[in-house]
From Swiss-Prot:
Keyword field contains Cell division: yes
SUPFAM superfamilies in the record: Cyclin-like
A Pfam family it matches: Cyclin_N
Species assigned in the record: Colletotrichum gloeosporioides
Record gene name: CYC1
Protein name in the entry: Putative G1/S-specific cyclin
Family label: Belongs to the cyclin family.
Gene3D superfamilies from the UniProt entry: Cyclin-like
Record bears the keyword Protein transport: no
Keyword annotations from UniProtKB, A to Z: Cell cycle, Cell division, Cyclin
A biological-process GO annotation: cell division
Residues covered by region (Disordered): 1-21
Alphabetical list of InterPro entries matching this protein: Cyclin, Cyclin-like_dom, Cyclin-like_sf, Cyclin_N, Cyclins_cyclin-box
Superkingdom per UniProt: Eukaryota
Purpose of the protein: Essential for the control of the cell cycle at the G1/S (start) transition. Interacts with the CDC2 protein kinase to form MPF.
């Protein structure tokens, strides 16, 4: 009987080193492998510049963050947006909080809605982007916010971020590290669920997406497959040195 994997990846530091495949690749397979490695290197460069620095966020904001992110996850689900949209919106919001101080949870929630709307326009097809009126339905009661004010908040956020919206989220790395169909589809789906569950936890916010993606994939493999399957799956990931921003 096959034993389940018992890899402990409860924290970022526990994520083990991935192993390169030793199988000989030729033709199209080798080209795809080289392309994936180039893509990962480029994404890792971008993530090094767009991962938020937790030390720059005020303690009062960190205290409010878990509840605000949980609310954002709920809004994202109700709007039926893509996984990439949620992950990008959380990154935009965290980066904004690193550079801009504001007062109270109400403003925090409004800016979270603005981040989700910005991310949706960057990720979603045009016909899937929610209208401003739809997004304003989620603005906290007690705060007056019409479309004109919301547009100003959006521009404020973009200016603070220097209009740099692109960011390789954990979902981008999950898809690169674990391509294919069949069981790997289940692994990606479970890894995404694990990643989403990690979002409200402040300790994960400054972890680079590539490291978080490996953590989530390991947990997914550990839950779904035997120890042999875990080694085979994790062995297809590129070599990298776990690090935090």
């Amino acid at each position: 009987m096959l034993k389940r994997a018992t890899v402990d990846v409860s924290s970022p530091a526990d994520v083990p080193q991935p192993k390169r495949r030793k199988a000989y690749l030729t033709g199209a397979d080798q080209a795809r492998d080289e392309y994936a490695e180039d893509a990962i290197k480029h994404m890792e460069y971008i993530e090094s510049e767009t991962t938020p620095d937790k030390r720059c966020i005020p303690a009062s904001v960190l205290e409010m963050r878990p509840e605000v992110i949980r609310s954002l996850i709920k809004i994202h689900k109700e709007l039926n947006l893509l996984p990439q949209t949620l992950l990008l919106s959380v990154n935009l919001l965290d980066r904004f909080c690193c550079k801009k101080d504001f007062l109270g949870q109400v403003y925090y929630r409004v800016f979270s809605c603005a981040a989700l709307w910005i991310a949706s326009k960057f990720v979603e097809d045009k016909d899937r982007v929610p209208s401003v009126c739809r997004v304003l339905d989620y603005v906290p009661s007690g705060m007056y916010c019409n479309s004109a004010l919301f547009f100003r908040l959006e521009i404020c956020m973009l200016n603070v971020l220097a209009w740099r919206v692109n960011h390789p989220t954990p979902w981008c790395f999950i898809q690169l590290f674990c391509p294919g169909e069949g069981n790997k589809t289940k692994v990606r789906e479970l890894a995404l669920d694990i990643c989403t569950a990690r979002l409200p936890e402040n300790r994960w916010m400054a972890i680079r997406p590539s490291i978080l993606a490996r953590h989530c994939l390991l947990h997914a493999c550990n839950n779904l497959f035997s120890d042999t399957s875990l080694v085979e799956m994790y062995g297809s990931m590129p070599r990298d040195k776990p690090s935090t921003h």
